[in-house]
Regions:
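Generic hydrophobic, amphipathic alpha-helix propensity
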Residues: 13-22, 38, 63-67, 71, ...
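C-terminal peripheral helix-coil segments that are non-catalytic and often amphipathic
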Residues: 1-2, 98-99, 135-147, 162, ...
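Amphipathic alpha-helical segments used for helix-helix packing
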Residues: 101-121
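Helix-turn-helix
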Residues: 16, 24-58, 62
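Amphipathic alpha-helical packing segments from all-alpha helical-bundle domains
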Residues: 69-72, 76, 120-147, 157-161, ...
Length: 202
């Protein structure tokens, strides 16, 4: 249990619930997380938890909304301070790496939702996140082509998919190794290879 006070304002209680779910997802299969486990982690009864979230699906919606809002806000801030499209791509990459390193339950939650056969609202939120994230990447990749940083014949969609795919690969490698810190160690080298692959060689 986290030892949080039992009497929190509704917004703080919802935020604490999201935090508890993300923490639990780092320790176990997200699909196996029960409302009992969430309530126990927070030091609450199930009844108290359900006063804020009527269903487990509502909890997952809140978690996915937080992931989307938090990740996109962070990458937007990172890109805004960059001096060029390629610098912005690198800033986004490292910010994303920092985010999943700090919250290892997040990629587990995302992978878990995308594997759901039903088109649930949490799954739709993940799909919207992937779409919005990809759109940001394609805009930067297009700007890089226009400014001559990137290859003129670069396939924007493929480059965006590969960008996300390398992060997913780093996450999978860290899960296999049981070593979250490995993501941060390997990321600079992986991005360097990616950057060389899309750069203008002229």
């Amino acid at each position: 249990m986290t030892g949080r006070p039992r009497h929190l304002p509704a917004d703080e209680r919802r935020a604490a619930t999201v935090e508890a779910v993300v923490a639990l997802a780092a320790e176990q299969n997200p699909n196996d997380i029960t409302t009992t486990a969430i309530a126990h982690r927070m030091g609450l009864t199930q009844g108290a938890l359900f006063r804020h979230f009527p269903t487990k699906d509502a909890i997952l919606q809140a978690v996915m909304s937080w992931i989307s809002e938090c990740l996109l806000a962070r990458v937007d801030r990172a890109a805004a301070t960059a001096t060029s499209p390629v610098a912005a791509l690198e800033a986004i990459y490292m910010t994303h790496i920092d985010f999943v390193s700090a919250h290892p339950g997040v990629p587990r939650m995302i992978f878990g939702e995308l594997q759901q056969p039903a088109q649930t609202l949490p799954k739709q939120l993940v799909q919207a996140l992937v779409h919005d994230y990809g759109a940001r990447l394609r805009r930067l990749l297009e700007a890089g082509k226009t400014q001559g940083e990137l290859a003129a014949d670069l396939d924007l969609d493929a480059a965006a998919v590969l960008f996300i795919g390398t992060i997913q690969g780093l996450v999978m490698q860290s899960l296999l190794a049981g070593d979250v810190a490995r993501i941060r160690r390997d990321a600079p080298g992986v991005f360097a290879i990616y950057r060389r692959g899309i750069a203008n060689s002229q």
